[in-house]
Amino acid sequence: MIPGEYRISTGNIAINTGRETCTIVVENHGDRPVQVGSHYHFYEVNPALRFDRQAARGFRLNIPAGTAVRFEPGQKREVELVRVAGAQRIFGFRGEVMGSLEADND
């Protein structure tokens, strides 16, 4: 094996099987690209991205870990989100939740 080399099996790898998902349409109203990582709480992404934020509360992008989706200025696209796993508590990001997702949904 060469350092940094990947050995990937053939075929597809199922991720987030059986988890709740939703699909939303996102549009970048900003003048710069916005990139969102795989585990970022989508509800709290850059305000230049316009979409139904309440629908995204408690969800992240349904993409492989360590990857990201880039939204170019003016671009509109549909993305699939997956429910955050675990205790349903979110801290950090933009500081808009800072605790349980079950608490006040405003």
UniProtKB/Swiss-Prot annotation:
Main location: cytoplasm
Top-rank taxon: Bacteria
NCBIfam families per record: PRK13203.1, urease_beta
Alphabetized InterPro entries for the sequence: Urease_beta-like, Urease_betasu_sf, Urease_subunit
Keyword terms: Cytoplasm, Hydrolase
Pathway recorded for this protein: Nitrogen metabolism; urea degradation; CO(2) and NH(3) from urea (urease route): step 1/1
EC numbers: 3.5.1.5
Subunit structure: Heterotrimer of UreA (gamma), UreB (beta) and UreC (alpha) subunits. Three heterotrimers associate to form the active enzyme.
Chain segments annotated as transmembrane: none
Reaction catalysed by this enzyme: urea + 2 H2O + H(+) = hydrogencarbonate + 2 NH4(+)
Family the UniProt entry places it in: Belongs to the urease beta subunit family.
GO cellular component, one term: urease complex
Name by which UniProt lists this protein: Urease subunit beta
Source organism of the structure: Citrobacter koseri (strain ATCC BAA-895 / CDC 4225-83 / SGSC4696)
Main EC class the enzyme belongs to: hydrolase
HAMAP family: Urease_beta (MF_01954)
GO BP of this protein: urea catabolic process
